[in-house]
């Protein structure tokens, strides 16, 4: 995430305050799923992939597990929130326009393992090795 911040600072500094705010949040819009007008989608994709392609050149994936190599997908989930925050700040999108759909997770979740892995990651610095 430090490298992501650096890319944003260099390529699109107007987004930096939004990035910093989003990184302090404990919630957000995840899973890279949304319904949006084409012009906003084009704007988002242009910005997102410009940042991600630059970031890809700065991150060495050597020695990482297949799970860890999916970092760009996870970073893109956070970046959607940065982009959205910026659009809200500029009044391109209004809060009232954001609709949330409730959905259920269809696969079983191993809650005990998930909680245990989260605590180990949070307090012991042990990285996740798989999804739950």
Q: Which functions belong to the PLM regions below?
A:
Residues 1-132:
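ER/Golgi luminal nucleotide-sugar-dependent glycosyltransferases, focusing on the catalytic module
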């Amino acid at each position: 995430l430090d490298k992501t911040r650096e890319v944003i600072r260099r390529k699109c500094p107007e987004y930096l305050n939004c990035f910093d705010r989003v990184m302090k949040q404990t919630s957000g819009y995840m899973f890279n799923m949304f319904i949006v007008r084409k012009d906003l989608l084009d704007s988002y994709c242009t910005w997102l992939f410009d940042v991600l392609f630059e970031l890809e050149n700065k991150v060495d994936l050597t020695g990482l597990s297949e799970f860890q190599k999916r970092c760009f997908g996870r970073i893109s989930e956070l970046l959607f929130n940065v982009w959205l925050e910026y659009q809200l700040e500029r009044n391109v999108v209004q809060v009232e326009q954001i609709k949330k759909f409730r959905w259920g997770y269809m696969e079983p979740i191993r809650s005990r393992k998930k909680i245990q892995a989260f605590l180990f990651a949070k307090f012991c610095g042990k990285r996740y090795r798989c999804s739950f």
